[in-house]
Amino acid sequence: MRRSRLRGLAAAMCAAVLPLVLPGEALAQMPSSLPPGPKVSIVSVTQPLPTQPQFTRVDVPYLRDLLKERSGGRIEGTVASHAERNLSGTELVRLVRSGQADIGASTLTTLSGDVPILDGVDLAGLAPGIGTARRIADAMLPVVNRDLERFGVRLVIIYPFPAQVVFCRQPFASLADLRGRKVRTFGNSLVDLVSALGAQPVSIGFPEVYSALERGVVDCAVTGTGSGVAARWPEVTTHVSNLPVAWALAGYMVNVAWWNKQAPEVRGFLEGTFREMSDKLWELGDAATRDGIDCAIGKAESCKIHTLATRPMTEVAATDADRAQLRDILEKTVLPGFVKRCGARCGESFNGTIAPLAGVRFGG
């Protein structure tokens, strides 16, 4: 009976939110005001750290300040990071489902423990550029929501962090040079990629990576360009690749029951907010990718978002051979590994939705 009720709520949610996810849909402008009505309080738990630009430049301005300002005080929001709530990120589906948060955000890799198909949106090597990553994200949003709705939640935005790249303690000139090295990874598809390169994947929590690199516990590590700079990795690494191996895509989700209780004008107001945030977050992900590299290599004139490294690194330019190897590993190792973990249905979803956009098909 409970499952039936959740499906009913999910169907109603689909009708209310679906316009947010249609590829190519013109973005609605956020309404400048709301008519008088009952006050709405919104609790949001979003980025891992309160210092991240996604939090300071998007979440706080929109989900706290602008909601109140543009709604004439009818909507009031509080925003906290995972760290401020002592969360790892894996709890977000359950947190939103239980109503402890109305809006939650986390990386798809983190959320995939509950919904395995989420891994397929951001497989290692799948999207060489951020434009492809966004087209895949837009197309997969309604697909993954069919699984998420079983939990009474629904994604309304998928957005990127800066490109995930390789930082190393010692020089390297190509992906092939990583053979034999110990590489910190996260998520199943990056483990598959690093293993296929002949390197040894090592799972280490992000806060511990700096000391692991410093002490030589790992030789290299994968993270976002800007994330590595923010964590002071240039102090303990010398070379950084500019080849995106993934995008650490993340998503904002809402509680379906909570959403359906809102008045139509409030839902419309929030839809406009999410649409505006989506554009800002994709623009930020694009700008922050190059900015992170420039800050890491000491290019002060173009380091605008992150902090300039005091110990400039060497940028390792991607080669055609690197790109070809990454695509080959995606086709032969990463994609089959994903389908094996997720099931045949995920392979069918991949071929039907992602393959036409990425040019890679499961099963050839």
Can you say where each PLM-predicted feature lies in the sequence?
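N-terminal secretory/targeting leader peptides
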Residues: R2, A11, A28-I130, L148-F151, ...
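Bacterial N-terminal signal peptides
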Residues: A11-E25
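A gly/proline- and charged-residue-enriched helix-loop-helix capping module
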Residues: P128-D147
